[in-house]
Structures are given as structure tokens and as C-alpha cells.
């Protein structure tokens, strides 16, 4: 996106939900996908960086997002919220269906510019987190790792937790790593800088 193009991030709305490519928006707007395990804070991330309270519905029940949700941002950019992975109470067949839907989008969508891969800063990445990061690297899809829930950890321990996450992911230094908290509104500007650099 050209520097002179100012993005009004508050001018955002949910556009549509899609189960497969026949339902995707048919235009050339750049898209940023958001991926992460259930309850990592994807909806809170979307709401926080867009300055909206309930645009993306947060849920106490993990596994709520079952479709690709496309958010229109100022008619210049879209966020695509993909179903949270790693939720045990969803059947194997349902998980396989979600996996196929996510893979189809990530590997075939020309509009896709980068993926924001959300992980929980408090814990070492899950097997699914590592698989997602490896998948994105394999397909050469630009990835921005956002480590959420930083407010749950004393600031003095952030570096230690960041090191644990990076080591587990075998983090590529050319990728961007952002410590984020929707509660304390930490990492918003860094997230936008990284996103706009890709579009």
C-alpha cells in the first residue's frame, strides 16, 4: 500500500463468511490472514487494532469461528480470520474439514499478502503452532508472529518467554515478532507497521 494512502482503521466491517473459494470476494484488495489456536486472542487482536469493541466476536467457547471471516477495512484492505486450530472438542472429521478449508485459502488465494500467526506468549508454542509456522515458511508466505496476552506476564520476563517461543518455532530472523496485549494496548503500532509493510 502506498505511503500516501491513509487507512482509516475505524472504517471496518465484516464483509462475508466463506467455506470455500467460490464464496471469496472477487476483487484484488490485499488480504492479511489471521491464524492461531482457539482462544489465543484472534478476535481481541482484530478488535484492538481496529479500535472496535465487538467487530470480531470474542467467545469464551473455543472453536467458535468455523468459516473464513472477511473483514473490510476502509475499502483498501481485508483481514481474514481463519478458524482456530487445536480445539479438542471438535470431531476429527470437522478438524480435517477446517484444515482443508484453511489450506485451500492459504495456498491458492492471490490476494493474500501475509499471515499474522498468533501465539500465546505465556506458553511454548503448541504442535499446531509449529506446524502452522512451518507450513507458511514452506509455501514462502510472509509471516508476522504476534505473541498475545503479554499483560499476563511481568514485563521483566517478556524476553525469556519470547526466546522460548522463537526457539520452539525455529524462528526466522527475517520475520517480524511482536509482543502484544489487547488489555494494555501494547503492540498495536508495531502490528500496523508490519501489516502495512506487506500490503
From Swiss-Prot:
Annotated positions binding GTP: 36-43, 63-67, 81-84, 148-151, 180-182
A Pfam cross-reference name: MMR_HSR1
Cofactor needs: Mg(2+)
Residues binding Mg(2+), per UniProt: 43, 65
Keyword annotations from UniProtKB, A to Z: Cell cycle, Cell division, GTP-binding, Magnesium, Metal-binding, Nucleotide-binding, Septation
CDD domains in alphabetical order: YihA_EngB (cd01876)
Origin: domain of life: Bacteria
UniProt xrefs under InterPro entries: G_ENGB_dom, GTP-bd, GTP-bd_ribosome_bio_YsxC, P-loop_NTPase, Small_GTP-bd
Gene3D superfamilies membership: P-loop containing nucleotide triphosphate hydrolases
Biological process annotations from GO: division septum assembly
Entry keyword Cell cycle: yes
GO molecular function: GTP binding; metal ion binding
Annotated GO CC locations: cytosol
Residue ranges of every copy of the EngB-type G domain listed in the record: 28-199
UniProt similarity note: Belongs to the TRAFAC class TrmE-Era-EngA-EngB-Septin-like GTPase superfamily. EngB GTPase family.
Function: Necessary for normal cell division and for the maintenance of normal septation.
Protein's name according to its UniProt entry: Probable GTP-binding protein EngB
This protein's encoding gene: engB
